[in-house]
Design a protein with these regions (language model features):
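Outer-membrane beta-barrel porins/channels
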Residues: 1-233
Length: 233
C-alpha cells in the first residue's frame, strides 16, 4: 500500500506560551507498507466477513522550521534573556501506525441486514518531533533547570523542565472504534440504514493539533435507486 504525508504548522496565541510564532512546513513524502486480509461469505444468508491488516509506514519529510522565541531571565541577577532563533531545513521522521479492521454483515430477516465494523489503530507511542522544535524545547528545559530552587520560581521551573524531550504531537494510547447498525431494503427503489458508532480516542489531550478525545456518533442513511444501474444516496 502506498501512502503520502505532508504537513504545515503555525503555533499562534498565548496558549502556546514561549513557542508561539513557531512555523514548520513539511514537504510531501511517499512511503509504502503492506496490506493483508481474509474474507468469508455465505450468500444464502447475506453473511460477509473480512479481516484486514495494514503495516506501519515510515516517512522522512523534508522540513523547514522557524523558531523565534525568547527565554526570559526572570529578573534574576546573572540570568540573562536568551534568544532562540532558527530558520533552517531538516528532516522530520514520522511513522504512521499499524491497524486492523474487522467487518461483519449478516442477514437477520428478509431484506434486512445487520453490520458491524471494529477498527484498531496502534497510536500508542506515535510522536512527531521536528528537529528545531525539539531543540527549542530542550533549551527551554535547560533554562528551567538553571533556575534557583526558590518557592516563587517553583511553578515556572516545573513548567520549563517538563518540556525536555517533548514532541509537537504525541499519542499514548491505542485507538479502538466500532460501528454497529441495521440496513433494510424497503422496496425496489428505496433502502435505508441506521448506525451507532464509538471511538475511544488515542489518549491525547484536546488541543488544536489533536482536536478530539474520543466520541459517539449516530448515522442515518437513505438510498434511492431510480434505475437498476445507478442510485442516489
Amino acid at each position: 500500500v502506498y501512502q503520502e504525508a505532508k504537513g504545515n504548522v503555525s503555533l499562534r496565541g498565548t496558549a502556546y506560551g514561549l513557542l508561539t510564532g513557531y512555523d514548520a512546513t513539511m514537504k510531501k513524502d511517499g512511503g509504502t507498507g503492506w496490506l493483508a486480509g481474509l474474507a468469508y461469505q455465505i450468500p444464502e444468508i447475506a453473511l460477509k466477513a473480512s479481516l484486514t491488516y495494514r503495516s506501519e509506514i515510515e516517512h522522512q519529510l523534508a522540513s523547514r522550521e522557524n523558531v523565534n522565541t525568547v527565554v526570559p531571565g526572570f529578573g534574576i541577577p546573572g540570568v540573562l534573556p536568551t534568544q532562540l532563533f532558527a530558520y533552517a531545513p531538516g528532516k522530520t521522521d514520522v511513522t504512521t501506525p499499524q491497524s486492523v479492521n474487522l467487518d461483519l454483515q449478516s442477514g437477520i430477516m428478509a431484506d434486512t441486514v445487520a453490520f458491524l465494523n471494529v477498527r484498531w489503530v496502534n497510536w500508542d507511542g506515535f510522536a512527531i518531533r521536528p528537529t528545531q522544535f525539539g531543540q527549542a524545547l530542550d533549551q527551554l528545559a535547560a533554562a528551567g533547570n538553571a533556575l534557583p530552587a526558590l518557592p516563587a520560581l517553583a511553578p515556572t521551573k516545573a513548567l520549563l523542565t517538563s518540556l525536555e524531550g517533548g514532541n509537537l504531537v504525541e499519542y499514548n494510547e491505542e485507538q479502538w472504534s466500532a460501528t454497529v447498525g441495521v440496513g433494510r431494503k424497503f422496496n425496489a427503489k428505496w433502502a435505508g440504514n441506521v448506525s451507532v458508532g464509538w471511538d475511544s480516542g488515542a489518549g491525547n489531550p484536546v488541543t488544536t493539533l489533536g482536536p478530539t478525545e474520543g466520541y459517539w456518533n449516530v448515522g442515518v442513511g437513505v438510498q434511492f435507486s431510480p434505475a437498476p444501474n445507478y442510485f442516489i444516496a
